Structure formats: structure tokens, C-alpha cells
């Protein structure tokens, strides 16, 4: 259960947008996670489609190809602006560079790494 209402979340985002040139919103749990009832994180993001650019952050680990491609496909079908993909290096076994290049070729999105 969320500790906030959708109205409170909208108010917080609008306040942050009014005070800043750039607002970073970290989403944990996936795009289809419900916020209230059947209203998902994706639905909420779509409210800001004209004002936003999405940066996908994914753990750089084996098997990420399908997860990243599904996320990109869902965002594109929702007419959202995707800026780039960031792969976060961790302790997991990393995916091969060829797979990351394949994702780039399919999605036409640039990528970078962070630790």
C-alpha cells in the first residue's frame, strides 16, 4: 500500500517542476505497478509525456535483453520520449557488449554505464 495519494504525488511533482529546470523521479517496481486501483506508474508518466524525457536504468546483468526491449516497447507504444539507457554495473555477471549493441541497434537508443 502506498503512503500517499495520487493527488499528493501530482502536487509534489508539479511543485518540483515549478521550482527546477530538471526533475528526477525514481520509479521502483516496474511500469505496470498500480499506484491507485488500476492506475499504474505508466499511466502517471503519460500525464507528463510532453514535459518529460525518460532515462531507463537497468542492472547490467545476464538476461537483460528481453527486460529492456519490453520496457522500451511499452514506453514507445505509450508515445513517451526516451532519452537513453543507463546500465548500472554491479556484482552480477555482466551482459556481453554484443548484446548491449544489439539492444542499441534494435531500439536506436544510446547507452552508457555507471557504477
Regions found by a protein language model. Name each.
Residues 1-35, 42:
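Phosphate-binding/switch loop-helix module in NTP-utilizing enzymes
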Residues 111-115:
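Short acidic-hydrophobic, aromatic-tinged amphipathic segments that line or gate anion-handling sites
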Residues 27-109:
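Conserved catalytic-core segment of NTP-binding enzymes
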Amino acid at each position: 500500500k502506498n503512503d500517499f495519494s495520487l493527488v499528493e504525488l501530482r502536487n509534489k511533482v508539479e511543485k518540483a517542476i515549478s521550482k527546477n529546470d530538471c526533475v528526477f523521479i525514481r520509479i521502483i517496481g516496474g511500469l505496470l505497478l498500480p499506484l491507485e486501483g488500476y492506475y499504474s506508474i505508466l499511466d502517471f508518466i503519460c500525464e507528463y509525456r510532453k514535459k518529460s524525457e525518460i532515462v531507463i536504468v537497468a542492472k547490467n546483468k545476464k538476461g537483460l535483453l528481453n527486460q529492456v526491449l519490453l520496457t522500451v516497447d511499452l514506453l514507445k507504444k505509450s508515445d513517451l520520449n526516451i532519452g537513453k539507457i543507463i546500465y548500472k554495473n554491479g556484482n552480477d555477471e555482466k551482459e556481453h557488449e554484443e548484446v548491449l549493441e544489439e539492444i542499441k541497434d534494435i531500439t536506436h537508443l544510446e547507452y552508457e554505464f555507471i557504477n
